[in-house]
């Protein structure tokens, strides 16, 4: 099992993730995504969007605002009920979520004793004001979830897209939670991104579609992101774990170095949200569906799939990370990412920094950069350049050498098994495209 400290070291060293405000001492629970991190994050997001919107004719996209009227959060139950229970250790002053510690045992931080304060609720929403006057009428919140932006746009999307039940609305966006304890690197943070889809169905079809989306979402991680199946599991919520809006729920969990944790939730939200907004807005018809064939009018039930994008980045790094002992006794760190997720698809090297080789390498870069994200490197030994690309997950390295000048061929080196092939420059585009399309995950990953 990979160690968390190895993932954090790689992420910071190679430019996947940086501590926010680091030059000022850092800000707990907040992270910046570097040049490689943003590429990996965008690639995961792109695959999710494709799997949701492009592969389902009855699912469309939305990008709702972060700021919304506070009445929305009153209706959804977040103002009154979106809180965690917290306790403080009286000896070391550390703060914990009450459900994360055994109050009958010693403090996990100072180990002195179980001298905890009584549990008290802590609302997780960030409150601010909009406009020039700071009073109760101008109170506004940073959204703690993206779902409510979908629900209040139910009628807008339904009418403008000419959709019929069942249909879904997908959204990727930032959410904010004032976590009592932000921990485990980018797993639990105050600012994060969600990939959510709300699927609206007839109440009598809720069980059928609930089962469908459980399987569909598990398949996404296994078949699309190529996450190892033995590190994934589907876990049902018991009645005490259900959110205030959920009738039933399942989590897809991944086995991180710190144990199995949720990466996506599939929830049967019933008609809770649409009914609440119907009541609080005094506009019931907006949240009602009229079936023109059966003449039936009803408030749809909702199945939610809610995945953490930033958690998915951490999962992908953990799942792809490997260390190998080579025959010469050296150690090789490899990120065995699927090529479609890799920040760079190709690295191009002139064997040595000679004008005639650099010119050809630059020409290849220009010819391919419109179709592939490419890293160009002409410094250091070829072996060190290979190792640098292995560490960041680049699947293919193209080397221009003196034979290239004679026969217009280059060496293509594959990341996982380090095999090399001579390929004509004119065939590079089709070769790389075919390799990515037919990529098989490494069984030794």
Swiss-Prot record:
Matching InterPro entries: aa-tRNA-synt_IIb, aa-tRNA-synth_II, aa-tRNA-synth_II/BPL/LPL, Anticodon-bd, Anticodon-bd_dom_sf, Gly-tRNA_synthase/POLG2, Gly_tRNA_ligase_bac, GlyRS-like_core
Molecular function via GO: ATP binding; glycine-tRNA ligase activity; protein dimerization activity
Residues engaged in binding substrate: 97, 145, 192-196, 304-308
Lineage: Bacteria, Pseudomonadati, Spirochaetota, Spirochaetia, Spirochaetales
GO BP terms, alphabetized: glycyl-tRNA aminoacylation
Family in the record: Belongs to the class-II aminoacyl-tRNA synthetase family.
Function: Catalyzes the attachment of glycine to tRNA(Gly).
Descriptive protein name: Glycine--tRNA ligase
A single Gene Ontology CC term: cytoplasm
NCBIfam families: glyS_dimeric, PRK04173.1
Highest taxon above the source species: Bacteria
Chemical reaction(s) catalysed: tRNA(Gly) + glycine + ATP = glycyl-tRNA(Gly) + AMP + diphosphate
Keywords: Aminoacyl-tRNA synthetase, ATP-binding, Cytoplasm, Ligase, Nucleotide-binding, Protein biosynthesis
Enzyme Commission number(s) from the entry: 6.1.1.14
Positions bound to ATP: 177-179, 187-192, 262-263, 308-311
Compartmental location: Cytoplasm
Pfam families noted in UniProt: HGTP_anticodon, tRNA-synt_2b
Main location: cytoplasm
Quaternary structure and partners: Homodimer.
Signal peptide: none
């Amino acid at each position: 099992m990979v160690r968390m400290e190895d993932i954090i070291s790689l992420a910071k060293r190679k430019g996947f993730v940086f501590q926010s405000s680091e030059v000022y001492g850092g800000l707990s629970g907040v992270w910046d995504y570097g040049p490689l991190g943003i590429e990996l994050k965008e690639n995961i997001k792109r695959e999710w969007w494709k799997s949701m919107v492009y592969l389902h004719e009855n699912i469309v996209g939305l990008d709702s605002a972060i700021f919304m009227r506070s009445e929305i959060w009153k209706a959804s139950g977040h103002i009154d009920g979106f809180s965690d229970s917290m306790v403080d250790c009286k000896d070391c002053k550390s703060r914990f979520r009450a459900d994360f510690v055994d109050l009958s045992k010693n403090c996990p931080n100072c180990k002195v004793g179980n001298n905890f304060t009584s549990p008290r609720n802590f609302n997780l929403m960030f409150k601010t004001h909009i406009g020039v006057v700071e009073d109760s009428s101008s109170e506004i919140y940073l959204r703690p979830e993206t779902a409510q932006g979908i629900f209040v746009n139910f009628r807008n999307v339904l009418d403008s897209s000419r959709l019929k039940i069942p249909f879904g609305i997908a959204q990727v966006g930032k959410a904010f939670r004032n976590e009592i304890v932000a921990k485990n690197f980018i797993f639990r943070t105050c600012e994060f991104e969600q990939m959510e889809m709300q699927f609206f169905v007839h109440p009598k079809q809720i069980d059928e579609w609930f089962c469908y989306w459980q399987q569909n979402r598990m398949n996404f991680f296994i078949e699309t992101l190529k996450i190892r199946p033995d590190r994934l599991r589907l876990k049902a919520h018991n009645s005490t774990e259900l959110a205030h809006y959920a009738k039933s729920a399942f989590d897809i969990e991944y086995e991180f170095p710190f144990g199995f944790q949720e990466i996506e939730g599939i929830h049967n939200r019933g008609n809770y949200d649409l009914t609440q907004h119907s009541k609080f807005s005094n506009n019931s018809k907006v949240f009602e569906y009229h079936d023109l064939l059966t003449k039936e009018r009803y408030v749809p039930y909702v199945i939610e799939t809610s995945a953490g994008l930033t958690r998915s980045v951490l999962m992908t790094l953990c799942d792809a990370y490997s260390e190998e002992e080579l025959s010469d006794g050296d150690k090789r760190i490899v990120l065995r990412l699927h090529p479609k997720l890799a920040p760079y698809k190709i690295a191009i090297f002139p064997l040595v920094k000679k004008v005639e080789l650099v010119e050809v390498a630059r020409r290849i870069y220009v010819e391919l950069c419109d179709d592939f994200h490419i890293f160009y490197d002409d410094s250091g030994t070829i072996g060190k350049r290979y190792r640098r690309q292995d560490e960041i997950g680049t699947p293919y390295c193209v080397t221009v050498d003196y034979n290239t000048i004679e026969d217009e061929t280059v060496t293509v080196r594959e990341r996982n098994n380090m095999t090399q092939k001579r390929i004509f420059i004119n065939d590079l585009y089709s070769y790389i495209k075919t390799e990515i399309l037919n990529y098989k995950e490494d069984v030794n990953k």
